[in-house]
Curated annotation (Swiss-Prot):
Family: Belongs to the HPrK/P family.
Region of interest: Important for the catalytic mechanism of dephosphorylation: 273-278
NCBIfam families: hpr-ser
Name assigned to this protein: HPr kinase/phosphorylase
A single BP term in Gene Ontology: regulation of carbohydrate metabolic process
Misc remark: Both phosphorylation and phosphorolysis are carried out by the same active site and suggest a common mechanism for both reactions.
Region (Important for the catalytic mechanism of both phosphorylation and dephosphorylation): 209-218
InterPro entries: HPr(Ser)_kin/Pase, Hpr_kin/Pase_C, Hpr_kin/Pase_Hpr_N, P-loop_NTPase, Ser_kin/Pase_Hpr-like_N_sf
Record flagged with keyword Metal-binding: yes
Pfam families named among the record's database cross-references: Hpr_kinase_C, Hpr_kinase_N
Amino acid sequence: MKPNVVSADVLFEEFRNLLKWEWVAGLGASERRFAEVAVRAARSGADLVGYLNYIHPYRAQVLGEREIAYLTNATPEDCKRRIARIVTLEPPVLVLADGQAAPDEVVSMCERAQIPMFSTQESAAFVIDVLRAYLSKHFADRTTMHGVFMDILGLGVLITGESGLGKSELGLELITRGNGLVADDAVDLYRINQTTIEGKCPELLQNLLEVRGIGLLDIRAIFGETAVRRRMRLKLIVHLVRKETLERDYERLPYEPLTQDVLGVPVLKVVIQVVAGRNIAVLVEAAVRNTILQLRGIDTYQEFVERHRRAMERGGAS
């Protein structure tokens, strides 16, 4: 699900302190929003904000020094035509950056067309970076998954599995080994760009871990600030299963790395069998270390296959 609403007044208040901008025109259009068609088609925040460009309608248009020069340094007829074309773009908001003074013609156009215009001393590049990051997260595809989301050895790991296998207890043991908790039970996941999933904890559950028989634990209060994380990028899913499930549904040595689709992004996946006597925390950390190697281009299984092939060739030659 992708939210499709952010109005000019919300955007203005969100960055009033950071960008120190002023609302210089179009005050009566505080409810003006990004067009739903643009939001649905956007692949990231980069599609929703940028420098003035006549071939990209429906996005926030930023006017820096060069854009203002283009609009004002021409014959009166050309200047009027260039400014009038902005209306056809139907921007949700115009942002005047680089400390540029608002040309009277642009202000008049915004008042007539009821287009909000903000003015800031900050550079146009900085304004675009800030707005793109905000809009990427605000309009991101999102979902909620059940599991324990953790920072393990610097990697965002989502622990999932069948009910009653001890996911939260495993999370607690991993915390005692120096890893960090992001979320327990419900994990909010966002696709912030075409290849990246970011996860965080719902506000109601922040810092909390539920362990059967003990109840709710405030991890931040018990283990300190370093035991919790606000958000992490999802890089690995560790799925816990019972012995019969593993034997029925999974190969012992899969030829290709397992993946799971999350919001259209393939995420590496490891399946771990849970039986009495196994140190699951050690196995999870080993899986994470192996995933880090895979992300660096080192595939232990493929290296073994190649080693086995060379051994067979040597045996056949002799």
